[in-house]
């Protein structure tokens, strides 16, 4: 049996045991829509489309756990391989990165963006050779009392990041990531969701920031990884290296509207300087009322204890859904075949 067939069978047999978190669906830049790799469909297609996003064994929309932060899985997700094409953008452009499905309300945490120069075609680059520098990293905002992941949800499940205007032209990989901290108070409880996309950046800049290997970005016990997000006023240190000179933690967030779609640019194609679309619109994100139930996936759970007998809360929480925790007002009774289990004082889950 082929490796792909074996993986397919494993994924199908485990379908009932997993629940979606998310992946990047597409990006919008200068009004142009570029499709990302879809791990929930493209993996199963004999001839998937050529896209800008890196493929990964993320069929469950799952995560990379802290115990694997020293492995190549943290670079661009599990067993990631380069996308077959790229999107051409200008240095200084703003890129809207759109996730699917809706990011869970419970999965609070930072949103972090990196770039790495491929020094050649990104479509064939060795991911271990990439050196990442941070161009954005937003955590907890004490003024709004929101996490960056909250802001992403409120912004239509999208995040706006800006390419440095003085960046040297070349082929780069954009590494965009959410780190969910709902289980972060326990060892190996944080969840990293790295997503990688190939960019061909054009411009006249000469800035070539130094970077670090992907396997050196984080450690399992870093202050921003092993962290309790449920304290009254979190003083949260965004993990990873410092922002490059001139970068900010995040730019003002707005939603972007695509006016046309484009296919990934294949290696060796002529460089065409992109121009802004004539009717691209952006708007401040409306406040999105979060749902009262969530679905989560756990690939490995920290030591747990049985939850107290469920009380209050209407309805039934699905397997892998939240069923308790300080302040929780949703369902506390689990679906048949699962038990409400305490992961920490703030989060209990049907396991």
UniProtKB/Swiss-Prot annotation:
InterPro entries annotated for this entry? AA9 (IPR049892), AA9_LPMO (IPR005103), CBD_sf (IPR035971), Cellulose-bd_dom_fun (IPR000254)
Catalysed reaction(s) here are:
[(1->4)-beta-D-glucosyl]n+m + reduced acceptor + O2 = 4-dehydro-beta-D-glucosyl-[(1->4)-beta-D-glucosyl]n-1 + [(1->4)-beta-D-glucosyl]m + acceptor + H2O
Question: Do you know which Gene3D superfamilies this protein is assigned to?
Answer: 2.70.50.70
Note on cofactor: Binds 1 copper ion per subunit.
GO MF assignments: cellulose binding; metal ion binding; monooxygenase activity
The free-text biotechnology note states: Lignocellulose is the most abundant polymeric composite on Earth and is a recalcitrant but promising renewable substrate for industrial biotechnology applications. Together with cellobiose dehydrogenases (CDHs) an enzymatic system capable of oxidative cellulose cleavage is formed, which increases the efficiency of cellulases and put LPMOs at focus of biofuel research.
Pfam families in the cross-refs: AA9, CBM_1
Q: Could you tell me the keywords of this UniProt record?
A: Carbohydrate metabolism, Cellulose degradation, Copper, Disulfide bond, Metal-binding, Monooxygenase, Oxidoreductase, Polysaccharide degradation, Secreted, Signal
Record EC number:
1.14.99.56
The residue range of the signal peptide is: 1-20
Q: Which cysteines are joined by disulfide bonds?
A: 76-196
Q: Which residues form the CBM1 domain?
A: 315-351
Its required cofactor(s), as named, are: Cu(2+)
Q: What is the protein's major site of localization?
A: secreted
- Provide the binding site for O2: 182, 191
- Asked whether the keyword Coiled coil is assigned, the reply is no
One of the protein's GO biological processes: cellulose catabolic process
Q: Which positions in this protein are listed as binding Cu(2+)?
A: 21, 107, 193
Question: Where does it localize?
Answer: Secreted
- Domain comment, in the record's words? Has a modular structure: an endo-beta-1,4-glucanase catalytic module at the N-terminus, a linker rich in serines and threonines, and a C-terminal carbohydrate-binding module (CBM). The CBM domain is essential for binding to and subsequent oxidative degradation of polysaccharide substrate.
Concerning its family, UniProt says:
Belongs to the polysaccharide monooxygenase AA9 family.
Q: State its role.
A: Lytic polysaccharide monooxygenase (LPMO) that depolymerizes crystalline and amorphous polysaccharides via the oxidation of scissile alpha- or beta-(1-4)-glycosidic bonds, yielding C1 and C4 oxidation products. Catalysis by LPMOs requires the reduction of the active-site copper from Cu(II) to Cu(I) by a reducing agent and H(2)O(2) or O(2) as a cosubstrate.
Instruction: Report what the protein is called.
Output: AA9 family lytic polysaccharide monooxygenase A
Q: What is the scientific name of the source organism?
A: Podospora anserina (strain S / ATCC MYA-4624 / DSM 980 / FGSC 10383) (Pleurage anserina)
Q: Which gene encodes it?
A: LPMO9A
């Amino acid at each position: 049996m082929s490796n792909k067939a074996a993986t397919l069978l494993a994924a199908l047999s485990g379908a009932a045991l997993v629940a979606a978190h998310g992946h990047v669906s597409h990006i919008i830049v200068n009004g142009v829509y570029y499709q990302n790799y879809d791990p929930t469909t493209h993996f199963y297609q004999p001839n998937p489309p050529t896209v800008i996003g890196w493929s990964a064994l993320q069929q469950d929309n799952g995560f990379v756990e802290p115990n694997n932060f020293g492995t190549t899985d943290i670079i661009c997700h599990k067993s990631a391989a380069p996308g077959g094409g790229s999107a051409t953008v200008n240095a200084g452009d703003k890129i809207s990165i759109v996730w699917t499905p809706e990011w869970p309300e419970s999965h609070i945490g930072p949103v972090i963006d990196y770039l790495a120069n491929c020094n050649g075609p990104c479509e064939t680059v060795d991911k271990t050779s990439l050196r990442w520098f941070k161009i954005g990293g937003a955590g907890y905002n004490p003024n709004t009392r929101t996490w960056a992941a909250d802001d992403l949800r409120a912004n239509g499940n999208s995040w706006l990041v800006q390419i440095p205007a003085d960046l040297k032209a070349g082929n780069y990989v954009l590494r965009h990531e959410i780190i969910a901290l709902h289980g972060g108070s326990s060892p190996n409880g944080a969840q990293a969701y790295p997503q990688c996309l190939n960019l061909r950046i054009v411009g006249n800049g000469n800035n070539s920031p130094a970077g670090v290997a992907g396997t050196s970005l984080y450690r399992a016990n870093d202050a921003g990884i092993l962290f309790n997000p449920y304290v009254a006023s979190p003083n949260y240190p965004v993990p990873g290296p410092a922002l490059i000179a001139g970068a900010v933690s995040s730019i003002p967030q707005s939603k972007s509207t695509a006016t046309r779609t484009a296919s990934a640019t294949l290696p060796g194609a002529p460089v065409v300087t992109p121009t802004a679309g004539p009717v691209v619109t952006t708007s401040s994100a409306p406040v999105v009322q979060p749902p009262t139930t969530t679905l989560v996936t756990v690939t490995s759970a920290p030591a747990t204890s049985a939850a107290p007998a469920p009380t209050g809360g209407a309805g039934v929480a699905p397997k892998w859904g939240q069923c308790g925790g300080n302040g929780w007002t949703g369902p506390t009774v689990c679906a048949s075949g699962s038990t409400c289990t305490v992961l920490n004082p703030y989060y209990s889950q049907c396991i």
